[in-house]
Amino acid sequence: MRKAIISIAAAAVALISIFAISILAIAPNVSRADDANTVPSGTTRNVAGIVTHSGSRVLQVGTAFFVAVPSMAFPGRSFVYLVTAHHNLLDDDGRPRTGLLLTLEDSKTGAMREDPLPPETRWVLDPSEVKADVAAIPLTPTGASIAPIPLGSLLGSDDPLARPETGAQVYYLTAATVGVNQHRFEALARFGHVSVPAPADTEVIGAGLQTLGYLDGGGAPGFSSGAPVFVSAGLRFALWGILEANTSLNTDPVFSGLAGVLPARYVAETVRKMGEVQDKTLQGSAKVPGGPKVPE
């Protein structure tokens, strides 16, 4: 497996001319906790699906979501990253999948559309835990309705030991198309509660040993792996982590109905480091004649 820290630098250099440009002028709002079994406004447009085609069939592979990291060099702006479970980018033999597409909402039509995803070799892994099942890439799809999750809304982004309480309400999102005659994008919300807040070692199919918490949500479909999991934390919802639908515990009756959650600190470590590298790269490029400029 490639070294993550090298991947960060390589990704920043390779993508800077395309995604300098993945900077938002305004950071998204923090999600507020509403009544039970409701999804706070502003969170449903952070999710996207990962699919591939087999003949005329569309195969659901996994789920991804967007995160916004404030730029330290350019106050008031944020870098936008697409995040998913790393194993979604690999086939059953551990090799990079080909032909992966991102499904998300078109801002003009409101319908689901498909955009090609960069190959696995362009994605960045956690610089501290290269085997953690997380991968990210700078990406701001043109003409798409997205609302990235602010870095400050990731549980444990400031305190790595922060964790939710047992029984706290959670929900996770997956992308879907609804409607027969008039198709439109919808983020499907599934609800549950925190079952095991303290992470424990668990084997994830396709990703090896991972440190996961658990939610009780009646079982999760395989394509939901990579989905953002939100937990009620006081007066707001925070990102608890990445859903892991396929673990070695799925066949254990003791853990029936539970799904794993990779803690959000792995996401925070990855995207924060990417933001630092992109900040430095953009600052250097701005000093070079003809280099990419940061939008005013």
Residue ranges and their predicted role:
Residues 45, 52, 60-61, 69, ...:
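Serine endopeptidase catalytic core focused on the charge-relay Asp
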Residues 62-63, 225-227:
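Beta-propeller and closely related beta-sheet repeat lectin domains
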Residues 1-4:
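Positively charged n-region of N-terminal signal peptides that target proteins for export
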Residues 84-88, 174-176, 191, 239-249:
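Short beta->alpha transition motifs characteristic of CBS
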Residues 26-76, 291-296:
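Protease-domain processing segments flanking chymotrypsin-fold serine proteases, especially trypsin-like
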Residues 66, 228-231:
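A short, hydrophobic, proline-anchored segment that marks a local hinge/packing element in signaling
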Residues 10-25:
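Bacterial N-terminal signal peptides
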Residues 40-43, 230-296:
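C-terminal subregion of chymotrypsin/trypsin-like serine protease catalytic domains
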